[in-house]
């Protein structure tokens, strides 16, 4: 949205010339500025030669809009900080954002962002709080929002933002609950949802929501189950799905959902397995697929599927590797790529992807760095980016990528 002389507003939807509704008298002053930056998609617009005296029709005002780069954020548990980077769309290289690292509460354990990229939320297990930040769309700088940090339960573990951007959910391991918050979409503030917290199994850890936002799933690592809930789209309240909780392998510690919303993948650290479940689109109930479980060995920590849904990846913390798979989008089955797994740093935990699906980023907790890889578009194989190792703080563990 443009404006002239701080009052005459004009919406622009395409390239080309534009004319404001209110004329400027000959010799009068004009001052064209950006009133509102575009949001779908997010762009950063600037005006060149936007002011002067109108001696005739003004034709030299130029508005230039560019998409901001994606940003990557990783929490550092020992340092109580978030390391922040811009992602180069062409090369996948990371560059530290000015002001990084940014302070969090004590022992940050996870970070999540809303789908619009406006807000980020850090679960602080040590201080029992959730730190909330606004994200500068142009620079990626994090700024604490008013009221942050927000109270959470004992040992808050993992958090996630609902696909609508209206709700935030966090597992609280000691209390055996998942806490739900409504997000003020204007300022990012959190308010507990009526009925929150909601009961889980024993020691809930990771959490996932299907892309439609209808169902939420929590892994319970002490009783080896998955709690499944229907999400009220209006209030954010959770209701257990019939048949929940569903059994899984020993010490389920990671969970992800296919971009199609058809399958759930759960990593069981003590078994060295990944369990695959089909989601009933009507009820949210889980059914083990014919190919489940698949054995990975080496203590699988994170399971992730790249954008597009064709390739899956499992971080093996003991072996210091990432295993790559092709994904059958019809059955959900994983088929491991031929050849050895991809080497990483020490104790790879989290893995994330740029929005295009061209690059993967692995957090190496004991190496205190992030390793960047090209994803082969045909096979899904990971190839290390030259010079693509980037320092973060101590005990970095959770990564989120923001952008489009």
Task: For the regions a language model picked out, list residue spans one by one.
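Predominantly soluble domains enriched in secretory-pathway, periplasmic, or organellar proteins
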Residues: 66-404
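Short, acidic Ser/Thr/Gly-rich low-complexity loop/linker segments typical of extracellular
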Residues: 7-17
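Secretory-pathway extracellular proteins and peptide precursors enriched for disulfide-bonded cysteines
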Residues: 34-39, 56-58, 325, 373
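Surface-exposed interfaces of beta-sheet-rich extracellular modules
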Residues: 1, 17-52
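Short loop/turn and low-complexity linker motifs enriched in small/turn-promoting residues
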Residues: 1-3, 59
